[in-house]
Amino acid sequence: IMLTLADIVRAQQRLTRYLQPTAVESAPELGAGVLLKLENTNRTHSFKIRGALNAVLALDDAARARGVITASSGNHAQGVAYATQATQTRATILMPKHTPQKKVQGVRRYGGTAVLFGDNFDQTEAEALRRARDEGMTFVSPYNDRQVMAGAGTIGLEILQQVPDVARVLVCVSGGGLISGIATA
């Protein structure tokens, strides 16, 4: 997936109506000059809302009418549920059987249909991909999706706007979507 700065700028334009920039705060207990980007203050308490919302907003009307599906054990699931509630799009969210009830309830609170399936994420994702193909829904990957990465990249744009002289940015890495977006910005 080739992500561009233009993708991230478009994502920021889409998200402005729905999300406020998150604060950057000093963390003196971590050392001189360490700042934290407070993504936990987003509506779903995670950066994942940015990518999920951008991915749903980037869909055309026909794709939204068919609905979206994803596989996630928590934060991305809640982000997709919020995004589809905000855009009046149907969402099916597959979650591994062991997903904490708090995460399942979060999905349902935002209007998503939570389906527990699979003993691990790979099984859950494979089933979501199968259903997307068979039922004509759009699969929104938690990490391997251009629009999801672009949404995450808006964090990088905000950092550059809020801290223009930033020397380095430390980013947690799991699936790679967050770091891809921030590094591109």
Residue ranges and their predicted role:
Residues 1-185:
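PLP-dependent amino-acid enzyme catalytic core
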